[in-house]
């Protein structure tokens, strides 16, 4: 994108004209800030790292959608921080691993828990980078994917039945409720119940953590909230 094109966009958004020379200076300063951000030292340990992506429009000759990968960390003391973001043509587990390996080179030493949307193969790639970290699949994405596979008239009931599972007060209760859910729907929606059985080892990791923070660690909503802004 040329400086003139950027200038036109800025004028449309903010109603103020900037010359191509001024835009050039601003973009150069911004590039320096971005490089500084992606080379900064990481000195803290993180209780939770959320990993997810969102597709945005990118112009490379022509305009197309690319996957903006985002890692957000919560420190042991509760501070929230965007650890890294990178643009890739498509979302891939390998991309997240590469981002984490870069953070490790810059000092990232310890992560207690990863929370992700459950992209196929991502758990294994995260374990390669941080073998001791726990892993949680995002319940919001689990429910969203399930509701795409069921009839409209069943969606409300299924949503309520799943809520009973992930909002249970203890892990054994959640596992019992999951078993009841699977038994209830296994004949009508076998693909749904089989998909839950395939990932059940990653559904209840949040019960290993204090009750006060469980609601914030069984989904990647924190990243989706950032993306809305």
Model-derived regions, located:
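Acidic/histidine-rich catalytic cores and adjacent linkers
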Residues: 120, 164, 168-229
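Alpha-helical oligomerization/assembly modules used to build nucleoprotein complexes
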Residues: 8, 22, 137-139
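DNA-recognition alpha helix
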Residues: 2-15
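Broad structural signal for hydrophobic residues in well-ordered alpha-helices, predominantly aliphatic
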Residues: 10, 126-127, 185
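Conserved beta-strand -> loop -> alpha-helix junction used to position metal-binding or nucleic-acid-contacting
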Residues: 113-120, 125-161
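Short, solvent-exposed positions on alpha-helices
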Residues: 4, 21, 113, 141, ...
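A polyampholytic, Gly/Pro-enriched intrinsically disordered region
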Residues: 45, 153-170
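RNase H-like nuclease fold core
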Residues: 16, 20, 25-115, 120, ...
């Amino acid at each position: 994108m040329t400086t003139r094109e950027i200038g036109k966009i800025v004028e449309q958004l903010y109603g103020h004209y900037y010359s191509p020379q001024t835009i050039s200076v601003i973009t150069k300063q911004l590039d320096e800030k971005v490089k500084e951000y992606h080379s900064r030292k990481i000195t803290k340990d993180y209780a939770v790292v959320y990993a997810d992506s969102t597709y945005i429009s990118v112009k490379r000759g022509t305009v197309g959608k690319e996957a903006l990968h985002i890692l957000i960390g919560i420190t042991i003391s509760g501070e929230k921080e965007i650890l890294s973001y990178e643009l890739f043509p498509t979302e891939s587990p390998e991309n997240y691993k590469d981002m984490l390996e870069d953070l490790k080179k810059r000092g990232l030493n310890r992560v207690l828990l990863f929370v992700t949307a459950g992209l196929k193969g991502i758990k294994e790639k995260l374990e390669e980078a941080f073998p001791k970290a726990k892993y949680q699949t995002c319940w919001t994405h689990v429910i969203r994917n399930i509701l795409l596979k069921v009839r409209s008239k069943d969606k409300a009931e299924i949503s309520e039945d799943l809520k009973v599972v992930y909002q249970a007060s203890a892990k054994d209760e959640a596992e019992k409720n999951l078993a009841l859910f699977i038994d209830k729907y296994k004949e009508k929606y076998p693909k749904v119940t089989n998909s839950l059985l395939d990932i059940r080892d990653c559904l209840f990791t949040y019960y290993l953590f204090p009750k006060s923070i469980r609601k914030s660690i069984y989904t990647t909503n924190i990243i989706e909230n950032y993306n809305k802004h």
